[in-house]
Amino acid sequence: MSVTMREMLEAGCHFGHQTRFWNPKMAPFIFGHRNKIHIINLEKTLPMFQDALKYVRQLAANRGTVLFVGTKRQSREILAEEAGRAGMPYVDARWLGGMLTNFKTVKISIKRLKDMEAAKEAGALETMSKKEALMFEREMEKLEKSIGGIKDMGGIPDAIFVVDVGYHKIAVTEANKLGIPVIGVVDTNHSPEGIDYVIPGNDDSSKAVALYVRGVADAILEGRANAVQEVVEAARGDDEFVEVQEG
């Protein structure tokens, strides 16, 4: 997928925050202001977004994992949907401290959730009292909400993609600590520090968020498709197929 300037304008990617809330470190990406609202320079954003997508494409081609992070109301649904479409893990509820830096502990909760799912599938609820079944369902629901999106992650991701880096400071800090590259949408009220692939843009509009998230999901699918195509072409080679006759 190639994103155009027109699409970014239509999605409102250029609208920043009120000028009084600005972060001076975002000055290089600000075009000006209108009605006390900063306007982001999309001529800077577009190539930076394309660089981020190129990186994601290469990562996916090498079977890398990108963890999608977006827990704000306007990003939750689309983020979970697009991460699912790309077959990638995601966090759409609260970020639990230590989700990356203490992944060993998180893995215990993931195992518990998977065991509960298997037990439910096997009809365990039928052998429980009403109260036990209710408590079981509640615990499972709670685990599904907090870690359901990462239950198949397996290990530390190769990169994280964050919508609104200020809102997800803990996630960014944990990734920085572990040397995990961060792709992040940075609005005018936050700092681009600690973000390896900065996407200067509006992080509040659901239309803008949908554009970034779909773009990253598409890049992952393209990267995977390209890798498969290369394998198929390499397998074909110039060798002629010879059927071996049974003796």
Curated annotation (Swiss-Prot):
Coiled coil: none annotated. One of its GO terms (biological process) is translation. GO terms for cellular component: cytosolic small ribosomal subunit. Transmembrane segments: none annotated. Keywords: Ribonucleoprotein, Ribosomal protein. One of its GO terms (molecular function) is structural constituent of ribosome. Gene3D superfamilies: Glucose-6-phosphate isomerase like protein, domain 1 (3.40.50.10490), Helix hairpin bin (1.10.287.610). It holds the Pfam family Ribosomal_S2. CDD domains: RPS2. HAMAP family: Ribosomal_uS2_B. NCBIfam families: rpsB_bact. Belongs to the universal ribosomal protein uS2 family. This is Small ribosomal subunit protein uS2. It comes from Cupriavidus metallidurans (strain ATCC 43123 / DSM 2839 / NBRC 102507 / CH34) (Ralstonia metallidurans).
